[in-house]
């Protein structure tokens, strides 16, 4: 078992909310509120409403689904629904230095378990900021496969760590929950996004589900191999996982303060082009019928998001031509 994973788990177990610097506490609250707003907005998407209605037939209790009417569900299902809703409109925040939307992967499980277990607001915030820390550090060492989307991969393990923290597990218990969660990792593809396949959003919701399930597996006595995380991230869902920098600045550098917030409801590689377009429109004030074409120079990842006629709402979030046209015609690229 890697020493770094064990020490990271011990940090999650031992760190209190009061140990988190005040500026980091403030930023954590901002990220929580931003993410909660995105979940509420996404809860109104038709497929999310339909899933919520279907799962209500076997509804449990103990955790709130953040949607109109505030329905309740068991914590695993509530976390799944809230995480799926939060992914549905492509407005969630993310890690600035590596790929991943840490808050939306971690917070749904934290909210569901925190409510179900009767934890205080401070305990919920602590689990959230610590889960975010684990997410950023695991993602920083993880090399995903070329087509992989990071929903339900390294960040799912961080959600499990946050859930285990809320259950009161010690460092070894949190490590076990994370290693058990390695068998729950998913293989979503970026091609889902450009094709408009909303299956991708379920992968986001499954991280919340894992946050509630993995600690229960650990408490039930399930065991995991010692190198489960290294093997899963380095050989199965990914092509490499470097642990040498996993603990750098731990407790001094808080990754949640290095996030980004989305101002446009589309995939973040599109955002720089929209920033430039917004400045041009503000300076020139053209009418839409005065614009014959828009030429964009961008980097490779954004350049593949080029379908001018996306097949549905979700695919439009991954179309640079659609986002640019929406900004010209509507004045913004919101959801």
Predicted regions and their residues:
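Acyl-CoA/ACP chain-elongation machinery
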Residues: 263
């Amino acid at each position: 078992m890697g020493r770094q994973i064990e020490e990271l788990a011990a940090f999650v177990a031992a760190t209190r909310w009061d140990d988190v610097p005040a500026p980091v506490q403030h930023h954590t609250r901002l990220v929580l509120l931003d993410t909660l707003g995105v979940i509420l907005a996404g809860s109104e998407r038709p497929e999310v409403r339909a899933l919520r209605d279907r799962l209500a037939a076997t509804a449990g209790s103990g955790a709130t689904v953040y949607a109109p009417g505030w329905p309740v569900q068991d914590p695993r299902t509530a976390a799944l629904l809230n995480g799926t809703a939060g992914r549905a409109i492509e407005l969630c925040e993310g890690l600035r230095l590596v790929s991943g939307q840490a808050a939306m992967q971690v917070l749904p499980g934290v909210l569901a378990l925190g409510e179900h277990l009767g934890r205080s607001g401070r305990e919920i915030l602590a689990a959230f900021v610590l889960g975010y820390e684990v997410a950023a550090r695991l993602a920083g060492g993880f090399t995903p496969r070329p087509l992989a989307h990071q929903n339900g991969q390294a960040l799912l393990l961080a959600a499990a760590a946050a859930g285990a923290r809320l259950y009161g597990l010690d460092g070894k218990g949190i490590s076990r929950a994370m290693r058990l969660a390695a068998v729950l990792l998913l293989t979503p593809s970026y091609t889902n996004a450009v094709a408009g396949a909303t299956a991708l959003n379920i992968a986001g919701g499954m991280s919340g589900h894992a946050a509630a399930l993995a600690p229960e597996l650990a408490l039930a006595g399930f065991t995991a191999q010692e190198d489960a995380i290294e093997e899963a991230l380095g050989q199965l869902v990914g092509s490499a996982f470097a642990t040498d920098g996993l603990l750098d600045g731990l407790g001094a550098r808080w990754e949640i303060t290095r996030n980004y917030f989305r101002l446009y409801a589309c995939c973040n590689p599109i955002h720089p082009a929209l920033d430039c377009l917004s400045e041009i429109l503000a300076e020139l004030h053209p009418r839409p019928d005065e614009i014959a074409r828009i030429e964009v120079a961008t980097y490779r990842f954004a350049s593949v998001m080029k379908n001018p006629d996306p097949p549905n709402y979700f695919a439009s979030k991954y179309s640079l031509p659609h986002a640019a046209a929406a900004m010209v015609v509507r004045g913004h690229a919101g959801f």
